[in-house]
Swiss-Prot record:
Homodimer. PANTHER family: DEFERROCHELATASE, DEFERROCHELATASE/PEROXIDASE. This is Peroxidase 2. It comes from Mycetinis scorodonius (Garlic mushroom). Keywords: Heme, Iron, Metal-binding, Oxidoreductase, Peroxidase, Signal. Belongs to the DyP-type peroxidase family. It holds the Pfam family Dyp_perox_C. Residues 20-58 form a propeptide. Its EC number is 1.11.1.-. Peroxidase capable of degrading beta-carotene. Residues 1-19 form the signal peptide. Its cofactor is heme b.
């Protein structure tokens, strides 16, 4: 792990004070930290420096002081709380929002330099019913999935009904979510207590979920053990692309910016906001590990290779497309190389060859790269999730079974940002992940994503529905393996809108 995260700047910590909203100027210049609240595993791309981001943003007209901080940062949070709430008194809530909550909201620019990071970063997003409660029901955001909410579309996402959903997500009762991130849970809890004290009886708590990076050398890895957050795209006007990294227009993630195909249907105040897809995804780690052990014969007895072929990366983060037979930690920890591949090789037959990366591998299903020609630039998300829950206990490991004790549940607090949910998260889940024939044109159908895919829609929405997967055996691409266990179980979620800071001040608080 890198010992430092971002350089400390004295004179260029933020964009000029004249560019800041009035509510922001009084506190942002006060250094509050000497160490970053973010993590920076070697395998993940670095964030730009404040100066680099300011220069890039100016070239395309982005205002990083007005964009909430979580949207463009990616999977770099250390400790994070998701505090879901309902609005009980809209008038009081709006008054508190303007006078006391708004100064706590953290912008993108603030997070890029340690000296300007707050003790705890705070972001805020609203569901459609939350916007309705604030009097904005008539001002739609031009996104039908956001408007209807996630609960009504659960089965279209592959969920076997909603019996496994956390009760708070069932329906449309959640109006908003605070996202609080810091380097200690005590900091997060203290900031949440302050917010609750400010808002008082204007809100009621619906649910909370505590996430945190896994310990020690597992920092940056999700609970199955794989390094995460390597392949987020580069954003024009914010970050510089590394080799193999897609460079995408900001409007794919920020409403009404260049590249947003629905700009004409957005209200003016929605500019520079983003649509947040949240999912609580339970990971059944003992069951996953048992499957690898029981089926290692598919990969000549190498359970780690089987897992790598299912994911598309070794646990280190090294891609199997570049390291098809053995892990390569040096490759994994080199952002100049670990994303620089496209699933093609000399003398490959692209419709049949799965010797390097299976067609069904998770990272190929969710980011097909040169399986598209020309490269796809429409269906992308920025992932900003974090693991939740404790490590696997000895009892779970020995029994190969996840505990039914709710306090031992573990998984991923999945967060995806996009400007159009139907082109982003929902499209990827429905049309790629859960589609046994995607990517099209392969001689042997790829099958369903073996990590997060679901075949429930083809089996009367039954849990643990059998799902076909090809390519796990590197010596026989025609072998179809049937998975009979869901390694990832949806516990529900919701769609939110993360508004700009100026929208919070000038529209949502009015």
């Amino acid at each position: 792990m890198r010992l430092t995260y971002l350089p400390l700047f004295a004179g260029i910590a933020i964009q000029s004070a004249s560019a800041l909203p009035d509510f922001f100027k009084s506190s942002v210049l006060k250094p509050r930290r000497t160490n970053s609240l973010l993590i920076n595993p070697d395998a993940q791309p670095d964030l730009p420096t404040a100066q680099q981001a300011s220069t890039a943003a100016a070239s395309v007209g982005l205002n990083l002081t007005d964009i909430q901080g979580d949207i463009l940062i990616g999977m770099k949070k250390n400790k994070e709380m998701f505090f879901f709430f309902s609005i009980a008194d809209a008038t009081a809530f709006k008054s508190h929002l303007d006078s006391a909550i708004l100064p706590l909201i953290t912008s993108t620019q603030q997070l890029l330099t340690v000296a300007t990071q707050p003790t705890t970063a705070v972001n805020l997003a609203f569901s459609q019913t939350g916007l309705n409660a604030l009097g904005l029901a008539s001002q739609g955001l031009g996104d039908s999935l956001f408007a209807s909410g996630q609960f009504s579309g659960a089965e279209s996402l592959g969920d076997p009904g909603t019996s496994n959903w956390v009760q708070a997500f069932a329906g449309t009762g959640i109006h908003g979510v605070f996202l609080l991130a810091s380097d200690t849970i005590d900091n997060v809890n203290a900031e949440l207590s302050q917010i609750q004290s400010i808002l008082g009886t204007s809100i009621t708590e619906a649910y909370r979920l505590q996430g945190e990076a896994r310990p020690d050398d597992q920092q940056g890895h999700e609970h199955f053990g794989f390094m995460d957050g390597i392949s987020n795209p580069a954003i024009d006007g914010f970050s510089t692309a590394l080799p193999g990294q897609a460079v995408l227009s900001p409007g794919l993630f920020l409403l009404a910016e260049d590249g947003d195909g629905s700009s004409s249907s957005r209200p003016s105040w929605a500019k520079d906001g983003s649509l947040l897809a949240f999912r609580q995804l339970q990971q059944r780690v003992p069951e996953f590990n048992k499957f690898l052990a029981d089926n290692a014969a598919l990969t000549q007895g190498n359970a780690d290779l089987l897992g790598a072929r299912m994911m598309g990366r070794w646990k280190s983060g090294a891609p199997v497309d570049l390291a098809p037979t053995a892990d390569d930690v040096d490759l994994a920890n080199d952002p100049q190389r670990n994303n620089n591949f496209n699933f093609t090789h000399p003398d490959f037959t692209e419709t049949t060859d799965q010797t390097h990366c299976p067609f069904s591998a998770h990272i190929r299903k969710t980011n097909p790269r040169s399986d598209f020609n020309p490269l796809n630039t429409a269906n992308h998300i920025i992932r900003a999730g974090i693991p939740y829950g404790p490590e696997v206990t000895d009892a779970e490991a020995s029994s190969n079974t996840s505990s039914t004790d709710a306090s031992l549940e573990r998984g991923l607090a999945f967060v995806a940002y996009q400007s159009n949910i139907g082109n982003g998260f929902a499209f990827i889940q429905q049309n790629w992940v859960d589609n046994a024939n995607f990517f099209f044109g392969k001689t042997t159908p790829p099958g369903i994503d073996p990590i997060i895919g679901s075949n429930a829609a083809q089996n009367n929405f039954a849990p643990n529905s059998p799902r076909p997967v090809s390519g796990l055996d590197p010596t026989d691409s025609t072998t179809i393996v049937t998975l009979n266990t869901d390694f990832v179980v949806s516990r529900g979620g919701e769609y939110f809108f993360s508004p700009s800071l100026s929208a919070i001040q000038n529209t949502l608080s009015v």
